[in-house]
Amino acid sequence: MIVIPRYTIIKEKASFRIQEILDNLNLKNPLVITGKNTQKYNKDFDFIYYDEIETSDLENIKNYANDYDSVIGIGGGRPIDIGKLIAHKSKKPFLSVPTTASNDGIASPIVSLTQPSYMTEAPIAIIADIDIIKKSPKKLLSAGMGDIVSNITAVLDWELGKIEKSEKYSDSSGIFSKTIAIELMDYVLNSNLEEYPKKLVKALIGSGISIAIAHSSRPASGSEHLFSHALDTMKEKYSIDTNSLHGEQCGVGTLATAQIYLEEGKLEVETFEMLKTSLKVVDAPVTAKQLGFDEEIVIEALSSAHALRNRHTILRNGISKEKAREILEKSEII
């Protein structure tokens, strides 16, 4: 059964309607998962700071919600992911109240606390207060664009899996995911960006719903996400000091893997330029240097990314470091 949000509010002062949505859902006693900087948006409900929760004990994490009829996540990615996981394990409804828009986890059924990610259910309601979100750091909003453009290569990878590995594919989910990305790129390339935070939130929610439709991260996560995860591995392996975000890394990864599709004749030059320019317009990184990585690190990441997950992508069984360098140079990432 496909589970998608029953209520989606994306507007100014939306956070003042949390109680209204709870009433509409006949929910009376929610537990809020939030952070110290976002607790101020909580409307007097019981709360736990997300960094006080032990997430490694998946079986007992449900106990946090024992005395409550629902769970609300208020904040960025981690409070929402932890809230989603507690709600799933305790079989309670989950409401997502994002305070920024850096990735589609605000609406998807995916919990990304571990790798591989964990499938739960999409939020029953998403309440996105644009007054709050537009005040979040520009870096986070730029990262959101990176997460959305990655849908283009993710869907191409999914289609490739269908062709080369007879993988199950959902036309409705794939088309929906790709259209969301194209519409947001069209907007940022042809406007003054005044409505960018609201347009971005709508796109991220749509992307999350495409995942719920497919019951898989496939429509929004492909080779570009593998590249991002590989960079995370490099950070830890080499103790690299960089504050690059998931969405930023996915944006650069999209350019790298789109270059491979371009060389195989499976992507138009115009689409590649659209991807790159839309990232630049919102000041998202498009080079390794902007992410804070040396050339050799991104080369190693691209050549090893295929091994991080059993998922067929344009990386197939891997590419050599020489080929990785060539791709990264042609796409002007290095």
Curated annotation (Swiss-Prot):
Top-rank taxon, per record: Archaea
Any idea of its EC number?
Answer: 1.1.1.261
The UniProt record gives the binding positions of substrate as: 104, 147, 229
Q: Where is it localised?
A: Cytoplasm
- Share an example GO biological-process annotation for this protein: glycerophospholipid metabolic process
Gene3D superfamilies named among the record's database cross-references: 3.40.50.1970, Dehydroquinate synthase-like - alpha domain
Q: Where does NAD(+) bind?
A: 77-81, 99-102, 108
Q: Which UniProt keywords apply?
A: Cytoplasm, Lipid biosynthesis, Lipid metabolism, Metal-binding, NAD, NADP, Oxidoreductase, Phospholipid biosynthesis, Phospholipid metabolism, Zinc
**Cofactors per UniProt?**
Zn(2+)
Which residues of this UniProt protein bind Zn(2+)? 147, 225, 246
The annotation note on the cofactor reads:
Binds 1 zinc ion per subunit.
What are the record's GO terms for cellular component? cytoplasm
Q: Which reaction does it catalyse?
A: sn-glycerol 1-phosphate + NAD(+) = dihydroxyacetone phosphate + NADH + H(+); sn-glycerol 1-phosphate + NADP(+) = dihydroxyacetone phosphate + NADPH + H(+)
Which molecular function GO terms apply here?
glycerol-1-phosphate dehydrogenase (NAD+) activity; glycerol-1-phosphate dehydrogenase (NADP+) activity; metal ion binding
SUPFAM superfamilies, per this entry?
Dehydroquinate synthase-like (SSF56796)
Pathway it works in: Membrane lipid metabolism; glycerophospholipid metabolism
Family membership, please give it: Belongs to the glycerol-1-phosphate dehydrogenase family.
* Biological function: Catalyzes the NAD(P)H-dependent reduction of dihydroxyacetonephosphate (DHAP or glycerone phosphate) to glycerol 1-phosphate (G1P). The G1P thus generated is used as the glycerophosphate backbone of phospholipids in the cellular membranes of Archaea.
Protein name per Swiss-Prot or TrEMBL: Glycerol-1-phosphate dehydrogenase [NAD(P)+]
Q: Could you tell me which species this protein originates from?
A: Methanococcus maripaludis (strain DSM 14266 / JCM 13030 / NBRC 101832 / S2 / LL)
